[in-house]
Regions:
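Heme-based O2/NO sensor domains and their adjacent alpha-helical segments
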Residues: 2-8, 19-108, 112-118, 125, ...
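Short, solvent-exposed beta-strand/turn "edge" segments of beta-rich domains on protein surfaces
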Residues: 11-16
Length: 158
C-alpha cells in the first residue's frame, strides 16, 4: 500500500501560512537588538520573497523563480558581504522557531526535524556566503529542494 506523502510545503500549511510566518518573523527581526541592524534596510517585500523561496524549496509552486524572478544565485547574492556570524545565525533560527510555534506551524517530530534541518543547513550556507566578496554559484545553479529525507552527505566547499 503506497502512502500519499505531502510535501513540506503542503504540510506546513502552504502559501498563507508561510507568508504569515515570515511577515511576523521579520517584524520580530527588525525589533531585535542583534539582528535589527542587519535587516534595517530590507525591502518591504523581503518577507514575501523569503516565503516564496522557502515554499519553492519545500515543494510548493515556483513563485520565487517565477513571479519574483528569483534564483538560488540571487538569494545567495543577498548574503554576500553581510559578515554574518554564529550568534546572529543562532538568533535568526531561534526567532523563526519561536514565531513558528506562536502561529501553530505543525510541531510533529518529522516535520520539525525537516524544518530544523533546512534552517540549520540554509543558515550555515548564509554565514559562509556572507563572508564572500563574489557569488560562489552561477545563475544556472538549480534551486535547492528539501523534503522529508536525509541530506546528500557532508558539505565540502568547492
Amino acid at each position: 500500500m503506497e502512502k500519499n506523502i505531502p510535501t513540506l510545503y503542503e504540510w506546513s500549511g502552504g502559501e498563507e501560512t508561510l507568508q504569515r510566518l515570515f511577515r511576523l518573523f521579520y517584524d520580530k527581526v527588525l525589533q531585535d537588538e542583534l539582528l535589527g541592524p542587519v535587516f534595517r534596510n530590507m525591502a518591504k517585500d523581503h518577507p514575501r520573497h523569503v516565503a516564496h523561496f522557502v515554499g519553492e524549496v519545500f515543494g510548493g509552486p515556483t513563485k520565487y523563480t517565477g513571479e519574483d524572478k528569483g534564483s538560488h544565485a540571487i538569494m545567495i547574492a543577498h548574503h554576500i558581504g553581510k559578515m554574518l556570524d554564529e550568534k546572529k545565525r543562532q538568533r535568526w533560527i531561534q526567532l523563526l522557531l519561536t514565531t513558528a510555534d506562536e502561529i501553530g506551524i505543525p510541531d510533529d517530530p518529522e516535520f520539525r526535524s525537516s524544518l530544523l534541518g533546512y534552517l540549520e543547513w540554509g543558515s550555515r550556507i548564509a554565514v559562509i556566503n556572507s563572508q564572500q566578496t563574489e557569488n560562489p554559484i552561477g545563475e544556472t545553479e538549480p534551486m535547492p529542494r528539501w523534503g522529508w529525507g536525509e541530506t546528500g552527505g557532508p558539505y565540502v566547499p568547492k
